[in-house]
Amino acid sequence: MRALITTANLIVGKSGATTVAGSSIGLSNDEDRKRFKQLREESDLIIIGGNTARREPYKRTPIPLYILTHTKVRLQPKNQLAKQFLLPPAQLFKEISENFPPIESSSAVKVLVEAGPMLLQSLIDQGLIDHLYLTTNLIKDGENRISVDHLVANFELVSQEIIEETKFEQYKKI
């Protein structure tokens, strides 16, 4: 059984919007994409939910992609590294801990959660997220607003940086 280090990444608009026209892409910019890529490079595995699988471009990922869903409908994008799981989140995390290759490794599995706000909040409420990277676009806004205060309530702020119209915050679980 391997330890998991779980990191989540989310971008929001100036008033907590999580999408523009149904996707987070409209809130992103070059600096956000650069940091997003860096998080992926430091991870072993990406977890997304079914809504994210349907709305965001996940046809290719540099590392395995696990889709956590509550439906039997096949959601996997045409991605050779994608697997779909119909499990409660805690059970999926246990499955990863016990069976993520190489099984004989003693190093922690670095999991990057790129889920939407509903699944992310559920994972946070279950205590399954260790680190949260929150990007706020200080200019743009959209729909599907969330309470950022509620999202970060179980975390402490580790660092904050503002570059042009974007605020980057890093949190760790309390």
Name what the model sees in each region.
Residues 1-174:
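Enzymes that bind and transform nitrogen-containing heteroaromatic metabolites
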